[in-house]
Each structure stands twice: as structure tokens, then as C-alpha cells.
């Protein structure tokens, strides 16, 4: 185990690298480095890894000019964790990113930071909000980047939340090409992330029509075409030859293998075996194939080693370049970790160790597979080969202990409520702080995980009524899954069944008192059923924990207004509007309160703002008409009244 990566050691190493005479002499010849990460792409869909589906002609051509690692493995089947491993060269046990919402500690070595300190221009261009540091995800990933282009936005009225959180590869590529074209007078490091193979699968034409029955495959074919467009541009600009291009998937997709529909739970080859290739400058070692085990944790050290430099001591991966030079390398172990089952469902986490053809999975029901004779990991040999399993278990425990030594304090702040909603829109069960773990084996609950995935998408798409029977089945099977109770409450609430929503929402709050969104929805349902005092108490708790949560504060204020506390209501509405001047309901309520109080001049700007913010609200136009009448503006009042009537008629 290498020593922790201290700030001072990093500074010394970087200074030595920058000041090295050999490096300085070759500075003008330093290659550009492009890292392309393909989200959710299985290894067995690559032509260069044996697929006959014809999905990846561009990647296959690139592979023929580079080095292919036939047995490359991810360290986690989930986007932020795997990308943290790729970019830091450390295992999740060290870098501390274990799930959504965790922050990357500043003391962990970071490839962009290292290259930037050596004079590289650095740019990141990502296809999903999952990797956007500014939206509650991937905090700390911006370190070392001159440009971090994510470009995601708050959901617009009438827009599906999913549409505000991801973008087509062609859109991201447009920003990439613009940035690359601006890089003059020095080498650049580009990280280009493509999200399009991720579910919900929504490939564009003509790929949708080419693969009508397999939208996942269509998404991969589209991603391949985008990679081809980038390569064509590099060639047209004379950049291709002196550019090192690394292509890797962060993880794969189960597609029903072992019962898992997508990814994030299991650690089998469907999600852990990933494509990995390197196109070296000058096409060195073109066409070479490496059969030895490689891991994504090895990628950052490899890129640094390719520059003739020694990776920082805290990087735990090992350069893959010796595997290219040595046709008979030693067998390398590969570790994978799955914490999502624990963080989101309260089940047991999974950890696996792969050594040669043997795969051991530490779980409540341990697993052992001989992948040489059983590549699909269908036959668990744990009982028949207990001695082998025990030996691998000891090695795994030793490995985990070693890579955990010197790890910085984990920064697990968790996600805010809006971020959890965004995750749900992408089909993830939104998770916050670690749930109390049980010894439930995820293998025994994978149907629950699948059902929860489907439920989250159904709710996002407005199909709440259809998903209620499914969620009732889930909570009957495992009532301790907090997200299932929450989704059931949401489904009832959005169908106007507020009374039925209250019990599952109460259970959700009981299971996770820190789950503020569950408490918010519970408060709304209590309000709708007339229990204003209890609802107010819940909103007060929310505002105390999240003072900037405008909707919670507005709801609290609206109860105050209804229960004879107008001063407190007005005070909190003003706080809402200080942070969010265009908050429609706060403007409307405050304006109406001031109007009813007879302070017409004070009411006017709030009512006019409400109409400006939501021009299709008949209620807002009607209230503004009342206001104009009191101010003696008869013509304006008539116009507003007419518009209110028109809107009311058009919605019938």
C-alpha cells in the first residue's frame, strides 16, 4: 500500500515533473490526451471484443490502431463512483465517492489537476447532470479543469425533468469541437463523456429505426457515430497522430442478466466487464491485444506513465503500459464494490474479487464462479469449493484493508431534495445518507430493485395510477424500503388520494427522518386533508433544516395566512421572494393578502409579477383585475377581467 497523498508531496512531485529537463526539452512534443468515457456500455457490444452486431464500426477502427485490453473491469457499477476511480487512480474505499452526492476530497490525487499543473489545457464535457458539480452531483470533479461544460438547467414548465438533465452526444460534441479548436500553444487534456446508452433508452434516428427492438443497442450505435465524428475532426485538424486517446466505459448494463434490469446492484460481467482501449501517439503498438486483467483504476496512472512520468504515490492503480510490453504478465486482481444496495435499500453491500478466472463475491450468501468454464457466472461453486472461496475471501479482506489505509475523511453530505428528484427522473432510486444496513442479500430482492426502477420512471412520466399496484406489492414484500413507501405516497397524492398517501409517507419519514422530501409530501397531504396544525409543524421542521427551500417556506406561510397569523405569513413570503423573486405562488399570495388588507399600492407589484411569471393563470389575472379596480384603473381592470375569462373558458 502506498502512502497517503499529502498536499506537500503532490506539490513537490508536480514541481519536479514541470522542471524536469527531459520533460522541458520535449514539451512541444507532448501529446494531447483525450479520455472518452462511454456511460453504461457493455463490453460484449463492441465489435473489437467479438460482437457480431455491427454496432461499433468507428470504435473498431480506432481499436485496430491502438491497444485493446480484452479483460478490463470497472470498480463500481454506478456512474459517479466509477468516474471518480477513473480520474483519481484510486479505489472507492480511498477516494470516498461511494454513491450519488458524495464529494471528492481535495487531498485525493486527480488526473486533470496533475495535467493542468504541467501546463495542459484541460476541459471536461459531460452528457448528464450526474457528473455536473454545480447541480448537487460530482462535487469536486471540477478541480483542475479550465472548462467544465455541463450545461444543465432547472426544469422548465411543461418540460420533462429528464430532458433538463441529459443531452445528446451530438450536443456535447459541438461544445467539444469548439473548445478543441481554441486550444493553441500547448497540449490539451479533454474528457468527453457520452451518456446516450443509459436508460431510459431513447436513441435518435436513424439508429432507432435500425435497431427497433433493441433501443439499448441503438444507443450504443449512436455513441459510436459520435466518437467517429470526433475522430474525423481530429484528423482534419492534424491532431490525430499526436493524440493519446483512451476509451473506456464506466460500467455496463445487466439487461436482465441475473435478474437485474439495468445496473448499480450486481458485480457480474454484464456491468463490470467494460471496453477499454488506448490509441497511442503515432499509433504505436497498433493492433496489439492484451489478455491480462486490467482495471479502470489503472487508467490514470497509465496516462501519466505514457508521458514518461511516475504517477503520484497515492494512486493505487498500476500503469497498463508494462502489460503491452510483457506478453506474459503476472495475474492482477481486480476489485469491485457495490454500495448502492445498502445506501438506497438498506440491504447488504457487495464486494467482489476477480483473480484470473475466479470470481468471488462477498455477500450474505457468498458466491464463487469459475469464469473459464462458466463465463456467465451461472453456477455458484461456493459450497463445492469452500477452500478456494475462503482463500479468496481472505485476499479480498486484505486487499480492502490495504487500499483503505490513509484514506481521507469521506465527504458524504448526501443529496438535497431537488437532486433526489432528478435522480428519480433518470430511473435511479434516489438515495441520501446511508440507510441502516441489514443482512438481506440483494440477490433475494433484485425484483424489488427492478420494480422500484420502473416505479420511479412511471411517476416521472405521470403514470402514477398504474404504478400503485406494483408499489403495494413492493411494500408488502419489503416494508423497510423507504423509497417504496415514499413512491407509494406520491402515487396516491398525485391521484388526489391524500388520505391514502399519509400512512406510507409517515412510514417513509419514520424509516428516514432525514428524508426531507418525504416529510414535505407528507405535510402537503396533511394540508390537503385539513390537518393544518400538523402540516405546519412539518413545514417548520423543513424550513429549520433547509432555510432556502422556497416551496416549503411558502407552504408554511400559506398555512399561517389561513390560521390567523398574517404577520408571520408575510414575513416568510418576503423571505421566499428575496431568494426567488419569480416565485409565482408567493407573489400571488402576498399580493392578495396586501389587497385584502387594503394596502393596494403595496399589493400591486406582487400581483403584476404573478401575472408576468405565469401569464396563463386565470386566477392571477382575476386578482390583478380586482387590484386595478381599487386603484381606479378601469380600462386595465377590464382587460385583465377579459383575459381571466378567456383563460377560464379555454381550459374547460
What does each model-found stretch correspond to?
Residues 11-19:
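Sec-dependent N-terminal signal peptides
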Residues 612, 618, 622, 626-650:
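TPR/TPR-like (Sel1-like) alpha-helical repeat modules
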Amino acid at each position: 500500500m502506498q502512502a497517503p497523498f499529502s498536499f506537500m508531496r503532490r506539490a513537490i512531485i508536480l514541481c519536479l515533473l514541470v522542471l524536469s529537463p527531459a520533460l522541458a526539452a520535449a514539451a512541444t512534443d507532448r501529446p494531447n490526451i483525450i479520455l472518452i468515457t462511454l456511460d453504461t456500455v457493455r463490453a460484449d457490444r463492441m465489435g473489437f471484443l467479438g460482437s457480431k452486431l455491427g454496432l461499433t464500426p468507428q470504435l473498431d477502427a480506432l481499436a485496430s490502431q491502438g491497444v485493446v485490453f480484452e479483460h478490463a473491469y470497472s470498480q463500481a457499477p454506478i456512474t459517479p463512483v466509477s468516474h471518480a476511480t477513473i480520474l483519481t487512480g484510486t479505489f472507492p474505499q480511498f477516494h470516498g465517492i461511494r454513491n450519488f452526492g458524495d464529494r471528492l476530497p481535495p487531498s485525493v490525487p486527480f488526473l486533470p489537476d496533475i495535467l493542468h499543473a504541467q501546463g495542459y489545457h484541460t476541459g471536461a464535457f459531460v452528457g448528464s447532470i450526474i457528473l455536473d458539480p454545480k447541480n448537487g452531483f460530482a462535487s469536486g470533479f471540477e478541480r483542475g479543469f479550465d472548462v467544465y461544460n455541463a450545461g444543465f438547467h432547472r426544469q422548465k414548465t411543461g418540460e420533462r425533468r429528464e430532458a433538463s438533465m441529459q443531452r445528446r452526444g451530438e450536443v456535447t460534441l459541438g461544445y467539444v469541437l469548439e473548445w478543441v479548436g481554441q486550444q493553441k500553444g500547448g497540449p490539451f487534456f479533454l474528457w468527453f463523456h457520452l451518456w446516450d446508452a443509459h436508460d431510459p433508452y431513447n436513441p435518435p434516428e436513424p439508429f432507432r429505426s435500425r435497431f427497433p427492438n433493441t433501443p439499448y443497442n441503438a444507443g450504443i450505435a449512436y455513441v459510436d457515430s459520435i466518437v467517429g465524428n470526433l475522430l474525423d475532426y481530429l484528423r482534419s485538424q492534424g491532431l490525430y497522430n499526436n493524440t493519446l486517446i483512451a476509451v473506456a466505459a464506466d460500467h455496463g448494463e445487466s439487461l436482465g442478466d441475473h435478474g437485474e434490469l439495468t445496473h448499480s446492484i450486481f458485480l457480474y460481467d454484464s456491468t463490470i466487464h467494460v471496453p477499454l482501449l488506448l490509441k497511442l501517439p503515432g499509433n504505436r503498438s497498433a493492433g496489439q491485444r492484451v489478455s491480462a486483467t486490467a482495471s479502470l483504476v489503472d487508467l490514470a496512472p497509465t496516462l501519466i506513465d505514457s508521458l514518461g512520468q511516475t504517477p503520484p504515490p497515492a494512486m493505487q492503480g498500476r500503469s497498463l503500459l508494462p502489460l503491452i510490453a510483457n506478453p506474459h504478465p503476472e495475474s492482477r486482481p481486480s476489485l469491485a464494490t457495490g454500495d448502492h444496495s445498502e445506501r438506497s435499500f438498506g440491504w447488504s453491500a457487495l464486494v467482489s474479487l476477480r483473480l484470473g478466472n475466479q470470481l468471488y463475491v462477498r455477500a450474505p450468501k457468498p458466491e464463487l464462479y469459475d469464469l473459464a468454464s462458466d463465463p456467465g457466472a451461472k453456477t455458484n461453486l461456493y459450497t463445492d469449493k469452500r477452500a478456494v472461496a475462503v482463500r479468496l475471501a481472505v485476499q479480498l479482506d486484505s486487499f480492502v484493508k490495504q487500499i483503505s489505509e490513509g484514506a481521507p475523511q469521506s465527504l458524504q453530505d448526501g443529496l438535497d431534495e431537488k437532486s433526489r428528484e432528478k435522480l428519480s427522473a433518470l430511473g435511479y432510486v434516489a438515495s441520501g445518507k446511508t440507510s441502516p444496513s441489514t443482512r438481506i442479500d440483494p440477490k433475494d430482492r433484485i425484483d424489488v430493485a427492478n420494480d422500484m426502477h420502473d416505479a420511479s420512471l412511471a411517476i416521472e412520466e405521470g403514470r402514477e395510477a398504474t404504478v400503485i399496484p406494483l408499489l403495494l406489492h413492493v411494500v408488502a414484500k419489503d416494508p423497510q424500503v423507504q423509497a417504496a413507501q415514499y413512491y407509494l405516497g406520491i402515487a396516491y397524492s398525485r391521484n388526489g388520494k391524500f388520505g391514502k398517501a399519509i400512512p406510507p409517507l409517515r412510514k417513509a419519514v419514520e424509516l428516514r427522518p432525514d428524508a426531507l422530501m418525504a416529510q414535505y409530501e407528507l405535510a402537503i397531504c396533511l394540508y390537503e386533508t385539513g390537518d393544518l396544525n400538523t402540516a405546519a409543524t412539518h413545514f417548520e421542521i423543513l424550513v429549520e433544516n433547509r432555510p432556502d427551500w422556497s416551496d416549503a417556506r411558502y407552504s408554511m406561510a400559506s398555512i399561517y395566512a389561513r390560521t390567523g397569523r398574517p404577520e408571520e405569513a408575510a414575513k416568510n413570503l418576503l423571505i421566499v421572494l428575496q431568494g426567488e423573486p419569480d416565485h409565482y405562488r408567493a407573489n400571488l399570495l402576498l399580493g392578495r393578502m396586501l389587497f385584502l388588507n387594503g394596502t393596494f399600492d403595496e399589493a400591486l407589484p406582487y400581483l403584476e409579477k404573478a401575472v408576468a411569471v405565469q401569464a396563463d393563470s386565470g386566477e392571477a389575472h382575476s386578482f390583478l383585475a380586482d387590484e386595478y379596480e381599487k386603484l381606479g384603473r378601469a380600462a386595465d381592470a377590464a382587460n385583465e377581467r377579459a383575459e381571466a375569462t378567456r383563460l377560464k373558458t379555454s381550459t374547460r
